[in-house]
């Protein structure tokens, strides 16, 4: 990280190559889900803004420096603890980057409230970010809103990367499409259709089942995603709603 922030050519080249792989994967996954963004902020473009604001806060006495040269915020008056903002070697942390990103977002889109949609394991992080932004003079700091959501688990239990029980989003979507195709075929809903039509219906039903099963649960709660249950053409499921809509359209 020290070499990266110092602009080391070799480290930056390796970083750029790896990032391109990651971004290409993100783009493909979002494309399959039908998701798009008006603007994307990269931490690599915002961390300097964050470091600048942290140093301003240090000069104004909002923050303090430890003997190891690291910079911290004392939030005990707010009922919290001490928060690291810059490491002793001068490199940034997530909070530094989020401060910089928030500043740029405000500059690009003058607002009075900023909304973050991030998992509930980051509740504390955004509580701290709101306080820090307010201390740094951003009037909308206290208006920061964190719309948290729970984690998605499988019937077999919680997904854990170290145990290899994590399901890739692309693999899950493909599995849902295949399950939708099999279920639709068993029920005779693909009879008389071309292969292209059948594949398109399976994609619409499969992804609809996945999205609806997740959306029907209170976003703040953890949930267990059951692929077989979600693809059912009866009950409170995406396929049932889609099927009902199609039937109503045929009547109209």
Named regions from a protein language model:
Residues 1-252:
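NTP-dependent nucleotidyl-transfer catalytic core
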């Amino acid at each position: 990280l020290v070499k990266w922030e110092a602009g080391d050519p070799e480290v930056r080249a390796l970083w750029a190559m790896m990032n391109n792989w990651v971004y290409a994967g993100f783009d493909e996954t979002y494309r399959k889900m039908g998701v798009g963004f008006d603007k994307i902020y990269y931490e690599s473009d915002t961390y300097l803004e964050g470091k600048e604001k942290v140093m301003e806060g240090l000069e104004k006495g909002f923050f303090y420096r430890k003997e190891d040269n690291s910079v911290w915020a004392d939030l005990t008056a707010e009922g919290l603890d001490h928060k690291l903002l810059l490491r002793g070697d001068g490199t940034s942390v997530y909070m530094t980057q989020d401060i910089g990103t928030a500043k740029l977002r405000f500059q690009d889109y003058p607002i009075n409230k900023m909304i973050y949609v991030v998992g509930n394991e980051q509740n504390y992080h955004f509580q701290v970010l709101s306080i820090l932004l307010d201390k740094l003079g951003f009037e909308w700091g206290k208006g920061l809103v964190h719309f948290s959501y729970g984690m998605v688990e499988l019937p077999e239990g919680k997904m854990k990367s170290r145990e290899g029980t994590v399901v890739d989003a692309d693999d899950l979507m493909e599995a849902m499409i295949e399950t939708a195709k099999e279920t639709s075929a068993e029920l005779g809903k693909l009879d008389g259709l071309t292969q292209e039509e059948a594949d398109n219906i399976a994609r619409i039903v499969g992804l609809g089942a996945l999205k609806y099963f997740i959306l029907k649960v209170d976003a703040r709660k953890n949930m267990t995603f059951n692929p077989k249950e979600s693809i059912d053409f009866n009950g409170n499921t995406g396929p049932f709603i889609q099927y009902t809509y199609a039937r109503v359209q045929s009547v109209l």
